[in-house]
From Swiss-Prot:
InterPro entries in alphabetical order: Ribosomal_bL36, Ribosomal_bL36_sp
Protein name: Large ribosomal subunit protein bL36
GO BP terms: translation
Pfam families, per the entry: Ribosomal_L36
Keywords: Ribonucleoprotein, Ribosomal protein
Gene name linked to the record: rpmJ
Gene Ontology molecular-function annotations: structural constituent of ribosome
Record-stated family: Belongs to the bacterial ribosomal protein bL36 family.
An example Gene Ontology CC term for this record: ribosome
Amino acid sequence: MKTRPSVKPICERCKVIKRRGKVMVICSNPKHKQKQG
């Protein structure tokens, strides 16, 4: 899980979702997981 100021989808399987007011990227590739914070 990477925490960065701006989250962007890296590949076509990345999904941008909002959880508890935080923007997150979830993907089948665990390296692509990101959260904003």
